[in-house]
Amino acid sequence: SEADIKTAMSQPPTRSKSYWSGAENYVADMVMDQLPKLIGSDIKDDLIVDTTLDMSLEEKAEKALNDVLAKDGKKLNASQASLVSVDATGAIRALVGGRDYAQSQFNRAVTAKRQPGSAFKPFVYTAALEMGLTPNSIRNDAPIKIGNWAPENYEQRYSGPVTLATAVAQSLNTVAAQLVAEVGADQVIKVAHRLGIESDLQANASIALGTSEVSLLELTSAYAAFMNGGFKATPYVVTKVTTAGGKVLYQANVANPPRVMNPDIVANMNAMMAGVIAYGTGKSARIPGWQAAGKSGTTQSFRDALFVGFTSHLTTGVWFGNDDGKSMRKVTGGGLPARAWKDFMIAAHKGLTPAPIFGGGQIIDNGLPVAQSAPNADQPTTIGNIISGTSGGGQATQQPTLQQRPSQQPIQPQIVNQTVANDDPQDLPPANLTDDTNPYSSNTYDTCDIPPADVGDTSPHTATVRPHRSSLLDVILGQ
């Protein structure tokens, strides 16, 4: 009646719950976008699409992000987050494109491209190891200037001579910038593209600090090459498409991925990234009982914060930020993203038997350079090799890790036990300034992976490939 209408119109409107809710709908949209490319656009029959998505992991991923956002998002001005988790083959096991699909269908894990910050540094260090350096190579952490660009560490703190392993763990910007100048920005880009980064990357000096934009999906999948022992892990979500009558229209074939890194280099990179979680900027990501490796990333003015890392079972990337690019309140990659990463990974690994990461978290170095040439891309493998060899999470079978080779015994083990009773940094031992093998830095213990001001805002400067200038310390240490 007229009276009922007036009464209803006088009441405040109520929002009905959206039918299309749940993070799995981000994946459903992704599948719909891919189908025309896989089977053509002339689709008339009902289809059955099999995917790699694990709904249990999907729910855990969505909960991990929303729990952190609900607790600290408003306080720290972080309104959005995304997560991607892949296995050793690149299969997408969980993907969350935002905090609420019903509110926003924009997929921040796939479509959005953001600067990765220091989460890009593993590609820099991989290029350096391929050039012949090792995790024990020494570089001077001190103020430097490359052209008109002067990269700085967080709060302008410097440690002097440090190993590359320490530089990775403490996310030292000056060392990463030096390495780009030595190996060349073009070589770093080649490594990133070889591992799976498909976005255009700018060949300038600041690439050392991750100033070129990438998607979380491609970044996470590129990290999976470290997790699986050096094979490309091209991300995929559709495994099979059939008609209602059973006719197969598409079948994924990921049985023989190319090798993209030398196994020795993978083992050393994994050892250095294990240090990030053991005693570096990613301490908040420690998973009780599991060995893990990864890298934090924070961009200019705290606009983006990321943590990407892996166990022997999964590789997961997490991003926090705002759609409008506004700054968060000092949120670093080792903060909210590392916490959400940890929460998800603990839930995802529940009930699985711990297994070490590839290489066991130990440095392989007999005082001689590790392999300098590009890996042999023709060496075949199978999806079964990858799953049985590097994806733990089942039976605790011993991996044929590189340090078991008699000719390549590591000279120095990294911290492999990351299980701690309390994640408070004060529980870690203090620096021993007289012990050169002590991984704990005296001045940069609490550093964050923050790039200096104006990174990427100055005119691009192409790094010049030039050899490292040996110092007396280099000669003494045999560098």
Protein language model features and the residues they cover:
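A generic secondary-structure signal for well-formed alpha-helical elements
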Residues: S1, I39, A127, M131-P135, ...
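Non-catalytic, structured segments within soluble enzyme domains
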Residues: S1-E59, K63, V96, L179, ...
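Soluble, non-transmembrane domains of envelope/secretory-pathway proteins that act on or interact
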Residues: T14, G147, V254, A292-Q479
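Conserved catalytic neighborhood of penicillin-recognizing serine enzymes
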Residues: K17-S21, D33, L133-V188, K232, ...
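A penicillin-recognizing enzyme superfamily signal
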Residues: T51-K74, L83-S85, L95, D100-F106, ...
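Active-site rim segments in enzyme catalytic domains, especially the processed small/beta chain
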Residues: N107, T111-I146, A150, Y279, ...
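Mid-domain, small-residue-enriched loop/turn segments at the edges of structured enzyme/sensor domains
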Residues: A150-N153, G184-S221, G230, T234-V237
